[in-house]
Amino acid sequence: LSPLDDQSVPLEVAPLVSAINGLLNRLKDSIATQKRFLADAAHQLKTPLAGLRMQADLAQRENSSATELKQSLQLIGRASIRATHTVNQLLALARAESGGNSLARQPCDLVELAMDVLQDSLPRAMDKRIDLGYEGVETGSPGVKVDGNPTLLKELMRNLIDNALNYTTSSADHPGVVTVRLLADRFGHVVVFQVEDNGPGVPEAERDLVFQPFYRALGTEADGSGLGLPIVLEIALQHQAQVTLEPAHPGRAMPGARFSVRFTSLT
């Protein structure tokens, strides 16, 4: 995709050549981005699949004890779950990116959707001993409906809650807390969905990077594919919503993170 020579063209066609070169440069950048994404996706899948193969080989050794066999099968199960999660996230990102104008929309009560996702997330929160709760307006309140796709909106909420649970830990000295919140301004036609935690937070230098595919916050060993927040951003864009990230508790040793998604509500 080499640019056209714009030095020896007639003055009349110079703007056209410049526009074509701009288009070629954007196309070149897009292709490079897709190549990086595919390479990252292949790497993310290669790691758990390599683990599956290694543990399968170990399980087939003739001298393997029952304990070793059980351990190998457990590791195979974990690796398969990780690979499946990555594939599901890739599919979710593809669905979000392909939405566009063809997105099937309907009036959606964000409180109702949030309650459904919260119920699904409670078992995992309980396993991690994290206090997962809700604050804000109630189902059916004025100003909480948006024009959107309920499946994708639930995916957005689920990924934000999963992200908070991934990066929040709980101990006797520091109980983990994740709060889901919905704020509505019926007169300003704005409804905001928030997920707030009291985990380590995201350094200011990384707050834009976390929305890039496969980016993982530095210095963390949290579970995840690195696709959850890019999915959130893409779904928000499809719904003309804005996503912001800020510390939940500035100044604390564990400042936490607060993700806010600002929608335009239906009248």
Regions found by a protein language model. Give the residues of each.
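Membrane-proximal HAMP signal-relay module
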Residues: 1-41, 45, 50-67, 95, ...
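A conserved beta-strand-to-alpha-helix junction within the catalytic ATP-binding
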Residues: 10, 14, 104-119
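Conserved micro-motifs of the catalytic ATP-binding
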Residues: 68, 98-103, 143-148
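Short alpha-helical segment of the dimerization/phosphotransfer core of two-component systems
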Residues: 78-83
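Short conserved segments within the C-terminal catalytic ATPase subdomain
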Residues: 124-139
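Short helix-loop "hinge" at the ATP-lid/N-box region of the Bergerat-fold HATPase_c
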Residues: 164-165
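Short conserved segment of the HATPase_c
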Residues: 202-214
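Glycine-rich ATP-binding loops of the HATPase_c
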Residues: 240-251
